[in-house]
Regions:
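Metal-dependent peptidase/peptidase-like ectodomains
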Residues: 6-14, 23, 32-35, 92-145
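Divalent metal-coordination and catalytic microenvironments
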Residues: 25, 39, 84, 137, ...
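A conserved active-site cap/scaffold subdomain adjacent to cofactor or substrate pockets
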Residues: 73-98
Length: 222
């Protein structure tokens, strides 16, 4: 079992950038406003924001996972869409980069005579573990043979359970299960990854044991 005090996983902001240009035939580029060109410059500028405006001591990563534009090889399209995520473990860094991202996108689009719309698709805060509750759960798990929790560094992954953690104290733990084939090197979420699900019995037992004993010891709060 693994756990981290304080921030365990990063926040994530998913965004969608729609670039509007002016489409035309590829033979007449001087008559158009190329949204693909604008999108390329925006993509590069966003990477530079992280490299030059985020504190190197903070965990921060910005990923563009989609870049969609056009329908034919010889046509400059009317629009282009970039979609991506910003992940960080620092609230101040997050707010600053989101503001700067919007500013940079609009300025670049204006430079190349286009316009841009930025939509925040979803937001998940950092996952914060409550130390007191975590230590209590660790004590319960020691009673079923799991001695102590191994610490892990803050992860760039995110977890929407963090939304609940903003309302009530929570703890969050990771159960390592290994692979069915020890030679496997497929990462999490890969379609070919196969975990050793036999280990899930241990996780289920810990979950039930902790829940029962917490309820027994906190009857006045239920």
């Amino acid at each position: 079992m693994y756990n981290a005090e304080g921030i365990m996983m990063n926040s994530v902001d998913e965004f969608k950038i729609t670039i509007h240009g002016k489409g035309t035939h590829g033979a007449y580029p001087h008559q158009e406003i190329d949204p693909i060109n604008i999108g390329v410059h925006i993509h590069l500028a966003l990477q530079e924001l992280v490299a030059r405006e985020a504190n190197p001591q903070d965990i921060c990563t910005l990923t563009i996972g989609q870049f969609n534009a056009g329908s034919a090889a010889n046509i400059i399209p009317e629009s282009a869409i970039l979609q991506g995520t910003l992940r960080t473990n620092n609230i101040s860094t997050r707010e600053n980069l989101l503001n700067r991202m919007k500013e940079v996108c609009h300025k670049i689009a204006e430079t190349y005579r286009g316009t841009v719309e930025i939509e925040m698709v979803s937001t998940v805060p950092p996952l914060m573990c409550d130390l007191k509750l975590t230590l209590e759960m660790a004590e319960y798990m020691s009673q079923v043979g799991i001695e102590g929790l191994k610490g892990i560094p803050n992860s760039t992954a995110t977890e929407d359970f963090a939304i609940i953690a903003e309302k009530i104290p929570i703890t969050y733990m990771l159960l390592t299960v290994g692979f069915m084939d020890e030679r496997s090197d497929y990462p999490l979420h890969h379609p070919k990854v196969q975990f050793d699900e036999n280990v899930c019995v241990i996780g289920a037992a810990c979950f039930v044991y902790c829940a029962i004993h917490w309820l027994e010891n906190h009857k006045n709060r239920v």
